[in-house]
Amino acid sequence: MADLEAVLADVSYLMAMEKSKATPAARASKKILLPEPSIRSVMQKYLEDRGEVTFEKIFSQKLGYLLFRDFCLKHLEEAKPLVEFYEEIKKYEKLETEEERLVCSREIFDTYIMKELLACSHPFSKSAIEHVQGHLVKKQVPPDLFQPYIEEICQNLRGDVFQKFIESDKFTRFCQWKNVELNIHLTMNDFSVHRIIGRGGFGEVYGCRKADTGKMYAMKCLDKKRIKMKQGETLALNERIMLSLVSTGDCPFIVCMSYAFHTPDKLSFILDLMNGGDLHYHLSQHGVFSEADMRFYAAEIILGLEHMHNRFVVYRDLKPANILLDEHGHVRISDLGLACDFSKKKPHASVGTHGYMAPEVLQKGVAYDSSADWFSLGCMLFKLLRGHSPFRQHKTKDKHEIDRMTLTMAVELPDSFSPELRSLLEGLLQRDVNRRLGCLGRGAQEVKESPFFRSLDWQMVFLQKYPPPLIPPRGEVNAADAFDIGSFDEEDTKGIKLLDSDQELYRNFPLTISERWQQEVAETVFDTINAETDRLEARKKTKNKQLGHEEDYALGKDCIMHGYMSKMGNPFLTQWQRRYFYLFPNRLEWRGEGEAPQSLLTMEEIQSVEETQIKERKCLLLKIRGGKQFVLQCDSDPELVQWKKELRDAYREAQQLVQRVPKMKNKPRSPVVELSKVPLIQRGSANGL
């Protein structure tokens, strides 16, 4: 029966993988719902306050770029050629061979440069033209040939074109998507969890599918009780920090994190899913690798290490078991549990795996940095070629002996190694850090310039264009059987109690890596959700032509901000009523649907604006004269933050104004006033609304 369950788990997992690759959006079991377009009023202020409404910030985001491009291509004739030129350059930069770049560069030059020059309408500098012409005459076509044009295209787009985008519906859509992104609160219900694919000291790793996009991931779940039992809180939190540091920027050679979240019992990392097994497993199955095959793995690992080191992260646990293969055979560095940030302070702890640890790591109290990883790389490459670490002769398991040999033994390289390979390994395995390859001031560049890699084009390595020496078998789960992986003994943690102080440690644990979420959405449901939302909004616009739009009331007035919130609706404070609010310098107005009367609360009636919590949801509490309270709830975190800020600012400024004006005797009045207003259907420019 157990065997049957294992087979069914494998089949279910493989089917999910195949469907996710083909049509991930079709596998989505939840729908992303974009907020109302009126969210723009709040989100624009929220983003502006954080310096996010700039050309550079929006153009560099995946969804921002897609919406900006769409606006230019469909609605702005003068910007269309610039965006098309930009896209052709980006395609050129990704070409694999010099021959392809030569053909493509000529086409780009003829279409976007020469044609414009002949028409005397080329809006670019003479230096940019000369730069490209000079290279093409010599048949030199580096990937960055058109970089001067990229800079000038962006310069031309960031002025009036960008301002028109900000005023358009496409920016409204950007605000809608950013609101969704900034309000992500993941739980286990947001994933379909499949079979277990691995286990570590604190928890397990599962294959899973994200419900709203259909994308497959690996879910690494750490048990909070087990962490507490082993006093591993610092390690768990450190892994989350290290993953957040390396998971930005384009690096296909590290198992990166897209999300982190936690439940009362577990810490969860949502990571890139790697289906091809690890190099330790393949070394045991395949046998040792040739120099050519090892070169392939070494090159991709070097680029992974370079990405980490550029972010001042030293990995500290480089070994074949931590190098995972994807379904095509390309590799990624996994498990950053021992990684360390050395930007402010160099580490000196002796951590890692014996047989791969650098001498300076083994010497207690000695500080080190990325130097440790280059020594470990030398050890690992030796193992791929010979089947054992250079310091683990005759399969000894004595850790002290392995460490002693690492500190004292001169590594003897076999005569069968090529001179180029010997040079590389001798450089990496130098005990003296000041003489070690990769530690002489230029980092990874020194290693990449080794004669052993002379035949490689590093741009081709980065683009993963070299054929992998080993392709994992398709239609198989390249992981141990679920029953072989086993499970933890629950008795171990039976006596462990999680206190409020334990949970407080993980208060800031949840995280969404913005660029990875945007990439996931762009690859899966972006077009579908946009099309559906466009249809919905078009229907609402037709319907609202008779009633008018909520936003219309704010036009031509000194309205600071407007949007939907929910307020407590009766004296017993038990029911929420959704209303549309308008914040003015001296008052807060709101209304219901259709022709419901407009209500008003003046700033002079407010005594304070505070944040409170009702049923675990953050709310705004407005204390009003006479001991009354006014409670407001927002649909998202950014809205709550911005409404709180703007209400407090308006209240503070109103208070300062009152203090400057001589006091007048007023009759007591009701704090909330109901306005008899013209129904929205009758509003127009004639009455200034």
UniProtKB/Swiss-Prot annotation:
GO terms for cellular component: cell projection; cytoplasm; cytoplasmic side of mitochondrial outer membrane; cytosol; membrane; plasma membrane; postsynapse; presynapse. Changing residue 353 to I: Dramatic increase in GRK2 protein levels. Residues 454-521 form the AGC-kinase C-terminal domain. The record marks 3-4, 10 as: Required for receptor phosphorylation. Its EC number is 2.7.11.15. Residues 558-652 form the PH domain. CDD domains: PH_GRK2_subgroup (cd01240), RGS_GRK2_GRK3 (cd08747), STKc_GRK2 (cd14223). The modification Phosphoserine is found at residue 670. It is found in: Cytoplasm; Cell membrane; Postsynapse; Presynapse. One of its GO terms (biological process) is viral genome replication. It catalyses: [beta-adrenergic receptor] + ATP = [beta-adrenergic receptor]-phosphate + ADP + H(+). Residues 54-175 form the RGS domain. Residues 1-190 are annotated as: N-terminal. In contrast to other AGC family kinases, the catalytic activity is solely regulated by the binding of substrates and ligands, not by phosphorylation of the kinase domain. GO terms for molecular function: alpha-2A adrenergic receptor binding; ATP binding; beta-adrenergic receptor kinase activity; Edg-2 lysophosphatidic acid receptor binding; G protein-coupled receptor binding; G protein-coupled receptor kinase activity; protein kinase activity. It is an enzyme of class 2 (transferase). Pfam families: PH, Pkinase, RGS. The active site is at residue 317. Residues 454-689 are annotated as: C-terminal. It comes from the Eukaryota. Belongs to the protein kinase superfamily. AGC Ser/Thr protein kinase family. GPRK subfamily. The PH domain binds anionic phospholipids and helps recruiting ADRBK1 from the cytoplasm to plasma membrane close to activated receptors. It mediates binding to G protein beta and gamma subunits, competing with G-alpha subunits and other G-betagamma effectors. This is Beta-adrenergic receptor kinase 1. It comes from Bos taurus (Bovine). The gene is GRK2.
